Amino acid sequence: MIWLQENLSIMLARHALTALVFVIGLSLSAYVYVDRTKRTAADQLSRLEDEAKNYEFLLQQRLDQYASANRALSAFFSASISVQPVEFDNYIRASQLFERLQGMSSFGYLPKVPAGQVDRFETEAGRLFPGYRIPQRRDGVAAYFPLLYGQHAADPTRINQLRGFDYSAIPVRWAAMQEADARDGPVATAAHAALRDPQRRRVVLIFSPVRRPMPAVGQHGNLNGFIFSSVYTEPLFRDFDNGRMAQYFDLEVFENKVSRENLIFDGDSVPHALKAGAIDTLAHRAKV
């Protein structure tokens, strides 16, 4: 299971009839709101509840796929003595991850580099990627987690621009990396702007630890680094069910709480959830 750093609130709206889905950590709740002046019939409420359940199932399935893809790649690195760039690229292509998972924009490997070994690491990495450097080294840092290998779904040059960048330098990402290490499993960040994206699109990054294999079951080896994958929130919420729900409802996504400042996706650019008196009737509640 992915453990989200922040809460997400998701609203589905259609004219006077609206449905609200809360994702709390990975808890999802669907609420249906009834216009008091028009009193929708029970069959309409039931039909909307069924739609909310179907949406919940599809979202759960997609989140599981994101987590599984991230975990599988980290297991591949953990089980290998040394993964070469061509092996990483072949794995991504053979798995068809970008084709199967809409919104997934990139995968990468972030090795753990102790601060005292940066110069040696840069020399070794430079044999694979000439000119490799970890820019903007920080005082008092025990270790860096720079991008070494990576693939981007739409723009291969993006990886070259980011190669060597220390992902732990961004607080929201470092917090998720630390939690992934503690949980020994995939952890997602809060939504934030993608690095060096001209459109400043919002992404969620998922981190899974890469460890040295241990002989005994249940023992955790030393941390060798992290696998990350990034997911654009826009196609995730708009297209993950092939746009079927968008034909019937407006989807609104809030982070942490329902407020204008926390809105991260709105299908029709009209924030129905912020209107006074929106919440009325609870129709469905579930966890994913």
Segments the model singles out, each with a brief description of its role:
Residues 45-53, 78-288:
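Intrinsically disordered, low-complexity polar/acidic regions
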Residues 4, 18-19, 34, 63, ...:
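Intrinsically disordered, low-complexity segments enriched in polar/charged residues with Gly/Pro
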Residues 25-30, 34, 48, 63, ...:
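Generic detector of bulky aromatic hydrophobic side chains
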Residues 35-68, 74, 78-82:
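Juxtamembrane membrane-water interface segments immediately C-terminal to a transmembrane helix
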Residues 16, 30-38, 66-71, 163-170:
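A broad, low-specificity signal for short, low-complexity segments enriched in glycine/proline
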Residues 3-38:
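Extreme N-terminal signal-anchor transmembrane helix of membrane signaling/transducer proteins, especially
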